[in-house]
């Protein structure tokens, strides 16, 4: 699959990367749309040196939508099925931006 890979601050390229296999209670999604938001632009710029990301390379884009294409063991017990349309935001709070400082 293709992904935008940030190699270092301000250094990025489109690369072929392996398609991950879903683990137990996980699903594999085909991403149909993804955004690069303000947080991603700060990460790409290297605005949080020594904190986030802990190391490069990274694949940015934590706001996405798509569909489930494969279930990991046990995922069906949570109600997931192939073909489900899904959306997600998969990031932890950074702890240093204004929103985190204000508890938002």
What is each stretch, according to the model?
Residues 18-34, 48-101:
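Glycine-rich beta-strand-centered segment in the early N-terminal region that forms part
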Residues 10-14, 38-39:
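Short N-terminal binding/cap micro-motifs at the start of the first secondary-structure element
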Residues 7:
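Short beta-strand/turn micro-motifs composed of small residues
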Residues 43, 100-103:
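Secreted/processed peptides and extracellular or luminal domains of membrane proteins
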Residues 1-4:
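Short structural boundary motif marking the start of a folded domain
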């Amino acid at each position: 699959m293709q992904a935008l890979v940030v190699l270092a601050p301000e250094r990025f390229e489109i690369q072929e990367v392996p398609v991950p296999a879903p683990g137990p209670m996980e699903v594999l999604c085909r991403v149909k749309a993804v955004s690069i938001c303000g947080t991603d632009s700060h990460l790409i710029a290297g605005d949080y040196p020594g904190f986030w990301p802990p190391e490069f390379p990274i694949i940015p884009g934590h706001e996405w939508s798509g569909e489930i294409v494969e279930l990991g063991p046990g995922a069906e017990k949570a109600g997931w099925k192939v073909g489900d349309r899904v959306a997600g935001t998969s990031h932890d709070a950074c702890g240093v931006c204004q929103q985190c400082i204000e508890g938002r």
